[in-house]
A protein has these predicted regions:
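Specific transmembrane alpha-helical segments of multi-pass solute transporters/efflux pumps
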Residues: 1-4, 34-80, 116
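Specific alpha-helical transmembrane segments that line the substrate/conduction pathway
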Residues: 16-27, 65-96
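Hydrophobic transmembrane alpha-helices of multi-pass small-molecule transport proteins
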Residues: 29, 48, 99-122, 128
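Transmembrane alpha-helical segments that form core, pore/gating elements
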Residues: 3, 25-30, 87-93, 125-160
């Protein structure tokens, strides 16, 4: 998905690329699945789920589209992948998910994994990361916020 969004954004721009991808996706859904029965969906789920989902997709698409280079797009995609760890944390904090002490090393290991991937073959160089963030701050900010939004989406929609 990261590659698709980045490739289309390079041709159509960040906003145009996102609009094209999601417009085409919507049309494909209508033709393959049909129109949803909106009245059968709980209003709270529809409102919260729609708001969070659309916000996340906007953050993801624009964060990839605004990345200055393809390498930054990969980094931004990895920043976005903080959402699984955040989802677990949110489920514990907000949904009362039962856990034990092993969750702490597990979450730390997940964070180290994201950092490891961000570092690539050369290792993690904080000066390069800071340089990339200062080059495209909006891109990294949107990816980071998107991770929190998607974790919130997973946590909130799980209640319905």
């Amino acid at each position: 998905m990261v590659g698709l969004i980045r490739g289309v954004s390079e041709g159509l721009g960040p906003v145009g690329g996102a609009a094209a991808i999601y417009s085409l996706s919507g049309l494909l859904l209508i033709f393959t699945v049909g129109f949803p029965r909106i009245r059968q969906i709980p209003k709270g789920y529809l409102l919260a789920g729609s708001l969070l989902f659309v916000s996340y997709e906007i953050c993801l698409a624009l964060s990839l589209g605004y990345a200055a280079t393809r390498h930054q797009a990969i980094e931004v995609g990895m920043v976005n992948y903080l959402w699984p760890s955040l989802t677990i944390l949110f489920a514990i904090l907000f949904n009362g998910q039962k856990t034990n002490w092993l969750i702490v090393p597990g979450l730390l290991l997940a964070l180290v994994g994201v950092c490891w991937v961000l570092g690539g073959d050369n290792g993690l160089h904080y000066d390069e990361i800071i340089n990339n963030i200062t080059t495209s701050p909006l891109s990294y900010f949107l990816a980071f916020i998107g991770a929190f939004i998607w974790a919130a989406y997973c946590t909130v929609t799980n209640k319905y």
